[in-house]
UniProtKB/Swiss-Prot annotation:
Belongs to the conotoxin C superfamily. Residues 1-22 form the signal peptide. Expressed by the venom duct. GO terms for molecular function: toxin activity. Disulfide bonds join C65-C70. Acts as an agonist of neurotensin receptors. It binds to human neurotensin type 1 receptor (NTSR1), rat neurotensin types 1 and 2 receptors (NTSR1/NTSR2) and mouse neurotensin type 3 receptor (SORT1). It comes from the Eukaryota. GO terms for cellular component: extracellular region. The keyword Disulfide bond applies. Residues 23-61, 76-85 form a propeptide. This is Contulakin-Lt2. The cysteine framework is C-C. It comes from Conus litteratus. The lineage of its organism: Eukaryota, Metazoa, Spiralia, Lophotrochozoa, Mollusca. Keywords: Cleavage on pair of basic residues, Disulfide bond, G-protein coupled receptor impairing toxin, Neurotoxin, Secreted, Signal, Toxin.
């Protein structure tokens, strides 16, 4: 949690520091994005997050956790049922 806090603080500093020098907000935000970021590269980064894994002859999507508590994956539930038998 502390890491997320410091990342947020550093991003705020990275945006507000150029503003104090008279730059526009749009230019400051664009300065945080790499110059070689193309729509194709951005699409590949986004699509890479949604991987499909093959497990027990079924295709299961791995949930992407945006919060601290993630929902259990389907095969974990199945493994728990097998263990309890």
């Amino acid at each position: 949690m502390q890491m997320a806090y410091w990342v947020m603080v550093m991003m705020m500093v990275g945006i507000t520091a150029p503003l104090s020098e008279g730059r526009k907000l749009n230019d400051a935000i664009r300065g945080l994005v790499p110059n070689d970021l193309t729509p194709q590269l951005l699409q590949s980064l986004v699509s890479r997050r949604h991987r499909v894994f093959h497990l027990d002859n079924t295709y299961l999507k791995i949930p992407i956790c945006a919060w601290k508590v993630c929902p259990p994956t389907p095969w974990r539930r199945r493994d728990l049922k097998k263990r309890n038998k």
